[in-house]
Design a protein with these regions (language model features):
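Domain-level signal for soluble alpha/beta catalytic cores
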Residues: 1-180
Length: 180
């Protein structure tokens, strides 16, 4: 069975009406995850990027509200994911830290033009702001080299890596070898 179950309460524009029922959605997702895990998996409550057309204060409040709801449902982790803008991820992390002490994973979606030193500095800053674990979400095996990945692991100790692409056997073997 799964060792980690993430709840998913992100909404598309078509689901905007559900934002008003955010607390109920989060409570239901967390309860279902707890039930199916039978206390044998870590339950992570997922928070994704808020709508870009909302103001900064509204986005901060949105992240904080979700963190409160997730904290109330006793998730084991708060999982920040699908943030391609570093400043937005910092905003979300600050909102979470203001209302919750639950361990938090902060994932930065990697853009192809990023430099590894810049990424390393940003991930370190996220940890100094209260992220328990940091990670990258990559959409191509060419997004980060083996050496860059190893540098990040050496510096940070633990790095969560989400691969958002289909792996061919050969590509999987190369990535797997670079991690071990």
């Amino acid at each position: 069975g799964s060792r980690l179950i993430r709840t998913n309460c992100s909404f598309s524009k078509a689901d905007e009406i559900l934002v008003n029922r955010l607390e109920a959605c989060i409570n239901s997702a967390s309860a279902l995850a707890r039930e199916v895990s039978n206390k044998r998996a870590v339950i992570a409550g997922r928070i994704t990027c808020a709508r870009a057309d909302w103001g900064r204060d509204a986005r901060f409040q949105f992240y904080g509200e979700q963190a409160v709801y997730l904290s109330d449902t006793w998730v084991d982790l708060i999982w920040l994911e699908q943030f391609s803008e570093y400043e937005e991820l910092k905003l979300a992390l600050r909102a979470v830290r203001q209302v919750s002490v639950i361990q938090t994973v902060a994932h930065l979606s990697l853009k192809k033009d990023r430099q590894s030193l810049e990424i390393l500095d940003q991930l370190k800053e996220l940890m100094s702001l209260g992220a328990t674990f940091v990670g990258l979400m990559i959409d191509s095996e060419k997004s980060i080299s083996r050496d860059q990945l190893q540098d990040l692991i050496d510096e940070l100790g633990i790095l969560s890596l989400i691969l958002d692409f289909d792996l061919e056997k050969e590509a999987f073997s190369r990535i797997s070898d670079s991690i071990h």
